[in-house]
Design a protein with these regions (language model features):
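Transmembrane alpha-helices of multi-pass small-molecule transport proteins
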Residues: 38-86, 165-168, 188-203
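Hydrophobic transmembrane alpha-helices of multi-pass small-molecule transport proteins
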Residues: 129-145, 166, 268-287
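C-terminal transmembrane-helix exit sites in multi-pass transporters
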Residues: 91-93, 110-132, 251-270
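Helix-helix packing/entry segments at the starts of transmembrane helices
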Residues: 104-109, 176, 180-192, 227-258
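Hydrophobic/small/kink-forming positions within alpha-helical transmembrane segments
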Residues: 22-30, 57, 81-89, 111-116, ...
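Transmembrane alpha-helical segments that form core, pore/gating elements
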Residues: 30-33, 41, 56, 148-208, ...
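Loop-to-transmembrane-helix transition segments
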Residues: 13-20, 60-61, 65-90, 154-162, ...
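C-terminal-most transmembrane helix of multi-pass membrane proteins
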Residues: 3, 251-303
Length: 303
């Protein structure tokens, strides 16, 4: 657990909060897909960040983490913010270009990359079961991408890159997790990502239509709610118990995509999805890659 979190062993309540977060994240993706028909990716990313910042500031004031917002890990915060923001750009672009289920599925490959990045960066041992899970996960990725079948889309690689960048963000947080409470990590990410994502608006600004404003605000609100639900869930139950439930966002996204857009997946994608999800569950349980956090970027671990 991170500093400032009070742990209570309430697995059922924790599981419900994590499932709730998974559903909220799927709704964020759905709204991003809707507004992406009217706004460019740069606009959507910026408003997601600035709206989340508005809703997270009261949470920060309420939580009052020990030491306030003072940090000794500024470089790691910058790395986490750069990789997390890059993951967000990739994820939102993929949502606009791909089926909702495909975007979520490829972005959810991040737990497969975590052991590899952790080994190369902090020399964290990769367990035997994790090695086989990683191999199975990459086989699943190939089945989803289907290179050579004539139905490959470049946006799939963008979604996959988002998964890798999200994994890099998670390992960055792992490095900070013993000295930084979760709310401080979220605060710095939201501040940095809001400021950085404001830059591209100088050449990409388009005034949203009146109805779109409400959707952008709702995206930010839901992102903050999802953040809170995940934090609450992981304060009530061990990650090994509730971590696998974070893949519920793929299930919810698949259902939403089918209901609203008539999206379906072929049998190779279903097999690939099974392998990726199983690989992610195994590596999450084995490495302790807790998922705490950033609403639309996916997950950030704490220990």
């Amino acid at each position: 657990m991170t500093p400032g979190n009070t742990y209570r062993n309430q697995p059922i309540a924790g599981a419900l909060f994590v499932l709730g977060a998974s559903f909220v994240f799927a709704m964020v993706g759905t709204l991003v897909k809707v507004v992406s028909t009217s706004l460019n990716n740069e606009m959507v990313v910026f408003f997601r960040n600035v709206c989340s910042l508005i809703f997270i500031l009261p949470w920060l004031a309420y939580s009052r983490p020990s030491g306030g917002i003072k940090t000794t890990c500024l470089r790691l915060h910058l790395l986490r913010s750069a990789s997390g923001l890059g993951a967000m750009y990739c994820f939102f672009y993929a949502i606009a270009q791909l089926r909702l289920s495909e975007a979520f599925l490829l972005f959810s490959t991040s737990p497969i990359f975590i052991p590899l990045i952790a080994y190369m960066w902090i020399r964290e041992e990769v367990t035997y079961s994790s090695r086989w899970a990683i191999i199975a996960g990459f086989i699943g990725i190939v089945l989803i991408l289907k290179p050579g079948y004539g139905i490959f889309r470049p946006a799939m690689l963008v979604a996959l890159a988002g998964g890798f960048l999200a994994a890099l963000a998670m390992v960055s947080i792992r490095r900070m997790s013993f000295s930084e409470p979760a709310i401080r990590i979220v605060f710095y990410f939201t501040i940095f990502s809001t400021v950085i994502s404001a830059g591209p608006l100088s050449w990409s600004w388009r005034s949203p239509m009146p109805g779109i404003w409400w959707l952008l605000i709702l995206i930010g609100l839901l992102a903050a709610v999802g953040q809170f639900f995940l934090t609450k869930g992981y304060s009530m139950a061990p990650a090994a118990q509730v971590g696998p439930l974070t893949y519920g966002n793929v299930v919810f996204a698949t259902i939403i995509g089918w209901v609203f857009w008539g999206e379906t997946m072929d049998y190779l994608t279903w097999v690939g999805a099974f392998l990726v999800c199983m690989a992610g569950i195994i590596t999450t349980r084995r490495t302790g890659a807790h998922v705490l956090v950033d609403a639309s970027v996916g997950k950030t671990p704490e220990r």
